[in-house]
Amino acid sequence: LIIFSYLFDILAIRTKFPSVILLVFTGIIARFISSSYGFDNFEFLDTLVPVLGTIGLILIVLEAALELDIKKEKIQIITKGFMAALIILLINIVLVSIFFEKVIGLPNPTSVIYAIPLSIISSAVAIPSASGLINKNKEFVVYESTFSDILGIMIFYYSIRQVEKGEALIGLEPILTLVGQIVLIIILSLAITYLLFQLIQRIEHHVKFFLILALLILSYEIGKDILKLPSLVLIFIFGIFLGNFSNLIPERFKKYVKTDNVGKEDLHEFNLLTAESTFLVRTFFFLFFGFSIPLESFIEMEPY
């Protein structure tokens, strides 16, 4: 499976066809072969696939953020990436929700909730597929797809909360609450990033970066599941800071934030660990995702 995934990556670079699509198709074919031999008990995938998906999304966004070179001249491309993500996401939500209402017959706001995941330009697909692009275009894809993930998750949880309360999706009070959550997650992300950065410098054990990844994933889950915050912002901020801390820390604050114990070798080691882990988790997630799709769902028009 690892060899196939590696070959798919090489093929994606040369053909610009997303390697993750090939992995999903491979999983679907494997499911068909397995079912033809009478192996149909795949209930364990209902638990495994979401876990791999969460870890994979975190690692993909982290890897992308670590590679970004943040400078003043990059503000324009960051702004363009954000605006493109927001506009495309909103247009997609409107169009897909209308399709669900008119063609499938889903009621509103259920159609909107179903439309949101399909409207996101997922970084899990876009970032790996952009590996063969020139740096400028690759950076734009990273920013646009990452912002699409973040905005999509925020809108999704916002919509679910509104439906659970029996309130309209658009209103002044809930929108102000959403803005407050964004401000809160940014503040928490900065605090957690500072603590993890200090922890990297203080750990003397030869195995420390897996601990940092574990703490980062734990913080993400607490923010997403318990606090109901858009925790992908945390991953994005941590990755950008760790990859650009020498440029991002103002001179007057450098005496409070020590960076002497974090060298280029440490960053290279962390980048390598993140890249290898991302490749491994991404491989098994999309394979198992394709494997988890019931074959009969391709001819079913009724939503789950």
Feature-to-residue mapping (PLM):
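Transmembrane helical cores of multi-pass secondary ion antiporters/exchangers
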Residues: L1-Y304
